[in-house]
């Protein structure tokens, strides 16, 4: 059968998946352990090809109900352009609006399950088909050594790279179960109900699961935390890192901290400790989130008030969210990619010296534009200028090495406008396209701009 479908190495087909599953049930290979898979004739030709086709098709099929539930929930909330919600930059306008009015934040690292069987146990609460769970266990045995008691981070990394779609489905199911319980308690313990909790479209019949939640509370939490009442509690997450912010006292944050640790340990059987959740005061510490350093600072301003014939100044100091480019981690990423050394001095890129001049310049410009696009929301542009300088000089040294010259001599031979694009701002393109653009429009683009077409962190920016 595999020889008949030899052209499906790089694609998934539901027909191929169906035929493979049928063959597996006919030949009864599901009962063979992972240790005997080398002698298994089912895997005799290409074991990875079978597993990849099956798991890809499996992930596609189980994603369909979640996608339909997403569409229905967004239509019910009258959200039309939900594609913009995919952008990670859409988180920052929310932070700008809410965080200046908050006092404390908790940096939360969501722990990975110690064993992949925990993911299966998490899904069994919402999946009633036993064959579904057996097939899921079969995939996990093929991708990892399930005889091991602990799954290391290296094993998880290999597992996620071998089949990212299948891994994301399992991980999102685990996160969904955790957040559904967490936000359910958050809504029950607050004076004000959260209207944004409808985004958790993955929940299956939440209010029909009250009995299950009651069982969780009775077994894991003898006292329901009804005292955790804070209408100014906000929660944001990206991948495995989340932030819990509040306007209340640190006592409430420490109570939520203990609750989360107990939730992971008692309900999900995931080892966690209090050190994984750090509580900081927003006015004194920066948040390392989405490759930005964000902090709340006072923005002093003098406002002149006019009452009848008298006028007098008023000192106003509202809080403002600062988003800063993390220069030291970013230089470390550039050094790892061989654009500079450890202290930020530009060096030539040896692997690109055999390309044409146009290709070398174009690749450096592509990296520079991507970084500028991602860090367009920075409130201070000075750090971004330094990154552009490193990339510009690295490009010059690469070209000079190719032409067997020095950087100074090479710059004298080329036009002064040769590298002008390295210093062109985002707003500079607006001035070139619209020469008569108003001063207000240019001022708008000289400030912070959040782009809703960015759905993942830039590779060089991802220093976490």
Swiss-Prot record:
Family the entry assigns: Belongs to the intron maturase 2 family. MatK subfamily.
Function recorded in the entry: Usually encoded in the trnK tRNA gene intron. Probably assists in splicing its own and other chloroplast group II introns.
Any Gene Ontology biological process: tRNA processing
Chief location category: plastid
GO MF entry, a single one: RNA binding
Top-level taxon of the source organism: Eukaryota
Keywords tagged on the record: Chloroplast, mRNA processing, Plastid, RNA-binding, tRNA processing
Species name: Castanea crenata
Name the UniProt record assigns to this protein: Maturase K
Pfam families: Intron_maturas2 (PF01348), MatK_N (PF01824)
Cellular compartments per GO CC: chloroplast
Subcellular location: Plastid, Chloroplast
């Amino acid at each position: 059968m595999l020889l008949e479908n030899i052209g499906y190495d790089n694609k998934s087909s539901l027909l191929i998946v169906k035929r493979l599953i049928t063959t597996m049930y006919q030949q009864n290979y599901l009962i063979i352990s992972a240790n005997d898979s080398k002698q298994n004739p089912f895997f005799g030709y290409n074991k990875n090809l079978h597993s990849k086709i099956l798991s890809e098709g499996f992930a596609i099929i189980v994603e369909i109900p979640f996608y339909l539930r997403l569409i229905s929930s967004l239509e019910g909330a009258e959200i039309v352009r939900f594609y913009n919600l995919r952008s990670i930059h859409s988180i920052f306008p929310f932070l700008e609006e809410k965080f200046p009015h908050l006092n404390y934040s908790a940096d939360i690292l969501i722990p990975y399950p110690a064993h992949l069987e925990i993911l299966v146990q998490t899904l069994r609460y919402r999946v009633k088909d036993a064959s579904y769970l057996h097939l899921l266990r079969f995939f996990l045995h093929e991708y990892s050594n399930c005889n091991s008691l602990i799954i290391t981070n290296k094993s998880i990394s290999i597992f996620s790279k071998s089949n990212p779609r299948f891994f994301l489905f399992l991980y999102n199911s685990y996160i969904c179960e955790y957040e559904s319980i967490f936000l359910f308690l958050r809504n029950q313990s607050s004076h004000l109900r959260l209207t944004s909790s409808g985004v958790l479209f993955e929940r299956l019949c939440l209010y029909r699961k009250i009995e299950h939640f009651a069982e969780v509370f009775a077994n894991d939490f003898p006292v329901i935390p009804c005292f955790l009442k804070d209408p100014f509690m906000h929660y944001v997450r990206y991948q495995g890192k989340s932030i819990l912010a509040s306007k209340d006292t640190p006592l409430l944050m420490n109570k939520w901290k203990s609750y989360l640790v107990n939730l992971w340990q008692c309900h999900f059987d995931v080892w966690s400790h209090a050190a994984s959740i750090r509580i900081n005061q927003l006015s004194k510490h920066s948040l390392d989130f989405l490759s930005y350093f964000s902090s709340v600072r006072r923005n002093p301003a003098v406002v002149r008030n006019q009452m009848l014939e008298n006028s007098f100044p008023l000192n106003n100091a509202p809080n403002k969210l600062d988003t800063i480019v993390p220069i030291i981690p970013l230089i470390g990423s550039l050094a790892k990619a061989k654009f500079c050394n450890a202290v930020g001095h530009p060096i030539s890129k040896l692997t690109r010296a055999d390309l044409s001049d146009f290709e070398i310049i174009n690749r450096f410009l592509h990296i520079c534009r991507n970084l500028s696009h991602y860090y367009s929301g920075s409130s201070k542009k000075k750090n971004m200028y330094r990154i552009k300088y490193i990339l510009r000089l690295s490009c010059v040294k690469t070209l000079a090495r190719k032409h067997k010259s020095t950087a100074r001599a090479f710059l004298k031979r080329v036009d002064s406008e040769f590298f002008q694009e390295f210093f062109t701002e985002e707003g500079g393109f607006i001035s070139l396209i619209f020469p008569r653009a108003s001063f207000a429009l240019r001022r708008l683009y000289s400030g912070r701009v959040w782009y809703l077409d960015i759905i993942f962190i830039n590779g060089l920016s991802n220093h976490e």
